[in-house]
Amino acid sequence: MTKYIFVTGGVVSSLGKGITAASLGRLLKNRGLNVTIQKFDPYINVDPGTMSPYQHGEVFVTDDGAETDLDLGHYERFIDINLNKYSNVTTGKIYSSVLQKERRGEYLGGTVQVIPHITNEIKERVYRSGRETNADVVITEIGGTVGDIESLPFLEAIRQIKSDIGRDNVMYIHCTLIPYLKAAGEMKTKPTQHSVKELRSLGIQPNIIVVRTEMPVSQDMKDKLALFCDIDTKAVIEARDADTLYAVPLSLQEQNMDQIVCDHLKLDNPAADMTEWTALVNKVRNLSKKTKIALVGKYVELQDAYISVVEALRHAGYSFDTDVEVKWVNAEHVTAENVKELVGDTDGILVPGGFGDRGVEGKIVAIQYARENKVPFLGICLGMQLASIEFARNVLGLEGANSSEINPDTPYAIIDLLPEQKDVEDLGGTLRLGLYPCKLAEETNAYNAYNEPVVYERHRHRYEFNNQFRPDMEKEGFVFSGTSPDGRLVEIIEIKDHPWFVAAQFHPELVSRPNRPQPLFHDFVRASITNKESK
């Protein structure tokens, strides 16, 4: 029978529930269990697709085209699985589904209420995740903190699941904070006690408490927490700030967290073999070289907006025993006069995805600098579109060339709406989303990176390269190295007389893994290292 683990949070948000859940998933997977994982977000948006990155961080896209929470990126990178649309559930999705059923008459004229209708829908999403993946273990992270009004239906639903399927099949893990008061020189357990008290008042008794802390937690403090929270002392797990995220599974294993979980859920799988993971962490901690890459974006104040890009750069660096330092460059501040000052000390330049016109001209200036000065360049989504516009303006001399997204009246719409998007009015969930094939041209940097004729990558865009400009740009050394199999859509572009200038319409960062870097990132970092060594 499938086992269910629920991870809740208390005291404050952003405690690392997602990393805890992902780390436990990795430990259980290495015990030979089939693990899947999901995130429940209590906000009323149907998905984060139309939310500002300042509000929510990056939007992580799954193979099947779901726009989801950035925690799913952590889940995929840690557990090395490809998640799906069932892996992220929001209050908006739940209510939308229930209201549609009510309109269809599925409730037989009954009064539709939070209990049982909303809670039943939530439970169905938990069970469906296990059914769809044939998982041995389903880990579900509940977003927000205990005590939030928005979280109450989710907490009630996961409370009911224990009654539905039995205590041996359900486990509750609660993540809290033990703050260190500098003035008093001591750590305080009271916020954790109150958080657990709140959780218990809702009918949920945690089986494990994971305490986030800056300082070591003494045995006396663990005993105190165990006493007040009514759990075994061994089930108080310390989550100290780690030098690398990938060390967290090893820290949890040292404290026997996965064994406690298996004992409770009556799983007799052998201990997790973390030899390869330990080797990875040791490698990450002992990188001997450095390279610096400029990330020119418009959300640089909130680095979570580009979290998968940064992780993909790091993964690529691990292959070369290199620590990739990211220099954050606000695209709005970049001008032709100061671009050298802002990016001249870097070994490579990356322009990530985005929407809208803010910061676009600064990104184009940075792209021009990379092209003219032979600096390795990787463009992603909007970065690919702007690389095309820069080339059209400055090489073909098409003054005013632009994207119809940015300037609907441009005389040269190098980037234009996909034909199927012309009559679309809704913004949410209407992009070209998910996994699509890309055919690579031989003897190109893209082909050399993948070494395969056809690859599959995840997309999230509404606009596309305008094919009427293909012949003129090709004549000037602009290479269309990746297209859709029918040749209609441009997927990857390159520049001929350049050491490494590649840009992709898709989002290669979404499929990178710490032990298996994404090919374009791998070769981009290699080119950046070569550039540094040649200076």
Curated annotation (Swiss-Prot):
Entry EC number(s): 6.3.4.2
InterPro entries reported in the protein's UniProt record: Class_I_gatase-like (IPR029062), CTP_synthase (IPR004468), CTP_synthase_N (IPR017456), GATASE (IPR017926), GATase1_CTP_Synthase (IPR033828), P-loop_NTPase (IPR027417)
GO function term, MF aspect, one: glutaminase activity
Reaction(s) catalysed (UniProt annotation): UTP + L-glutamine + ATP + H2O = CTP + L-glutamate + ADP + phosphate + 2 H(+); L-glutamine + H2O = L-glutamate + NH4(+); UTP + NH4(+) + ATP = CTP + ADP + phosphate + 2 H(+)
Pathway(s) this gene product operates in, as recorded in its UniProt entry: Pyrimidine metabolism; CTP biosynthesis via de novo pathway; CTP from UDP: step 2/2
Miscellaneous comment in the UniProt entry for this protein: CTPSs have evolved a hybrid strategy for distinguishing between UTP and CTP. The overlapping regions of the product feedback inhibitory and substrate sites recognize a common feature in both compounds, the triphosphate moiety. To differentiate isosteric substrate and product pyrimidine rings, an additional pocket far from the expected kinase/ligase catalytic site, specifically recognizes the cytosine and ribose portions of the product inhibitor.
Protein name: CTP synthase
Binding residues annotated for UTP, in chain numbering: S13, K188, T189, K190, P191, T192, Q193, K224
Boundaries of every Glutamine amidotransferase type-1 domain copy: 292-534
Swiss-Prot/TrEMBL keywords: ATP-binding, Glutamine amidotransferase, Ligase, Magnesium, Metal-binding, Nucleotide-binding, Pyrimidine biosynthesis
List of residues binding ATP: S14, L15, G16, K17, G18, I19, D71, R240, D241, A242
Residues annotated to bind Mg(2+): D71, E141
Matches recorded under Pfam families: CTP_synth_N (PF06418), GATase (PF00117)
GO biological process: 'de novo' CTP biosynthetic process; pyrimidine nucleobase biosynthetic process
Function: Catalyzes the ATP-dependent amination of UTP to CTP with either L-glutamine or ammonia as the source of nitrogen. Regulates intracellular CTP levels through interactions with the four ribonucleotide triphosphates.
Family from the record: Belongs to the CTP synthase family.
Organism (species): Bacillus cereus (strain B4264)
Enzyme active site: C381, H507, E509
Activity modulation notes: Allosterically activated by GTP, when glutamine is the substrate; GTP has no effect on the reaction when ammonia is the substrate. The allosteric effector GTP functions by stabilizing the protein conformation that binds the tetrahedral intermediate(s) formed during glutamine hydrolysis. Inhibited by the product CTP, via allosteric rather than competitive inhibition.
Region (Amidoligase domain): 1-267
Binding site residues for CTP: S13, D148, I149, E150, K188, T189, K190, P191, T192, Q193, K224
